Swiss-Prot record:
InterPro entries: GAF-like_dom_sf (IPR029016), HrcA (IPR002571), HrcA_C (IPR021153), WH-like_DNA-bd_sf (IPR036388), WH_DNA-bd_sf (IPR036390), WHTH_HrcA_DNA-bd (IPR005104), WHTH_transcript_rep_HrcA_IDD (IPR023120). NCBIfam families: hrcA. Belongs to the HrcA family. One of its GO terms (biological process) is negative regulation of DNA-templated transcription. Pfam families: HrcA, HrcA_DNA-bdg. This is Heat-inducible transcription repressor HrcA.
């Protein structure tokens, strides 16, 4: 689509704009590119790039800035790989492998600290499996279900029933579930209970079905996104001048539902993935870019992490930060088992 001269000028323009945030004029571009071209020739090339939708002229300046399409071409074809600017061994110490949730929060802080933008980490997906379940009577027709996951995490849920079960019935139900279904996926347990309900006493079967339902909800509800560094965006001129957009961004980080969807989609990709402008369609914010990568435990993808910042971000650096952090988290979580 572009000849070598146009590619060099576009690359120089994007790099210059990322560096100082100012629209790039023909004289500045001539110096930045290192090409011995007249300002008139450069203006002609810039006009062609503008016609292709790769750069645009802000109303307040005669210079040009990249569009989302221009950034995409730059990221896909023009990035130069630099040496790893971070000590992997040094950063490993910042992600303590003692507790999985501590690893996740430390990783989010590290991402925001290194990028000076927002770090996000989706906590490892939990399989809907229980290791042990117990019932505790709280009051008439009101019971506490205690669910222990395979990694030792304990969840408590209160259920209300139409029947007031006795202590012996509660013990019978928990013993049956633990002896027959411990270690199985919750969905499989639900299906088996449907098939075996006739062989069980009706009241007990109903209690167990309710317990399995709340167990599934309890385990799945632990999916979460850890966000760090939101205040970093206050120092980014691309955002700080528009309080309306800033409020939308902070709502995004507080609600987290859209972040969860984006990170979930990203977990199915291999390696680093970059969303520029509104490309993700999950976070429809044109001035935002997101760099993500999945992380693993023992070779299985269990979550995603990334950096969220302005479209005008140093992509080479962000890619390295995200890629290295995903590897560190994978190592830390695999070793913490």
């Amino acid at each position: 689509m572009l000849d070598s001269r146009a590619r060099l000028l576009l690359k120089a323009l994007v790099e210059r704009y990322i560096a100082d945030g100012q629209p790039v004029g023909s004289r500045t571009l001539s110096k930045a590119s290192g090409l011995e071209l007249s300002p008139a020739t450069i203006r002609n090339v810039m006009s062609d790039l503008e016609d292709l939708g790769l750069i645009v002229s802000p109303h307040t300046s005669a210079g040009r800035i990249p569009t989302a399409r221009g950034y995409r071409l730059f990221v896909d074809t023009m990035l130069t790989t630099q040496r790893d600017p971070f000590s992997v061994a040094g950063q490993m110490a910042r992600i303590a492998p003692d507790q999985p949730l501590k690893v996740i929060s430390n990783a989010a802080h590290m991402l925001s600290s290194l990028s000076q933008f927002v770090g996000v980490v989706m906590a490892p997906r939990r399989t809907s499996v229980f290791r042990h379940i117990e019932f505790l009577r709280l009051s008439e027709k009101r019971f506490l279900v205690i669910i222990v996951s395979p990694d030792g995490d304990v969840q408590n849920r209160v259920i209300f029933t139409e029947t007031d079960y006795t202590a012996s019935q509660l013990i019978e139900a928990s013993n049956f579930l633990n002896s027959h279904y411990a270690g199985m996926a919750i969905e499989e347990v639900r299906e088996r209970l449907k098939n075996e309900v006739e062989a069980l006493r009706g009241e007990i079967a109903t209690l167990m079905q309710e317990a399995v339902l709340v167990s599934s909800e309890a385990i799945e509800s632990r999916d979460e996104v850890v966000v760090s560094g939101e205040r970093n965006l206050l120092a980014v001129s691309d955002f700080s001048s528009d309080m309306g957009n800033l409020r939308k961004l902070f709502d995004l980080f507080e609600q987290k539902a859209q972040l969860m969807r984006l990170l979930d989609v990203s977990s199915r990709a291999e390696g680093v993935r970059i969303y520029i402008g509104g490309e993700s369609q999950v976070i429809p914010y044109q001035e935002l870019s997101v760099v993500t990568a999945p992380y693993e435990v023992d070779g299985q993808v269990v979550g995603t992490l990334g950096v969220i910042g302005p479209m005008r971000m140093p992509y080479e650096k962000m890619i390295q930060i995200v890629d290295i952090t995903s590897k560190l988290v994978s190592t830390a979580l695999s070793h913490s088992k």
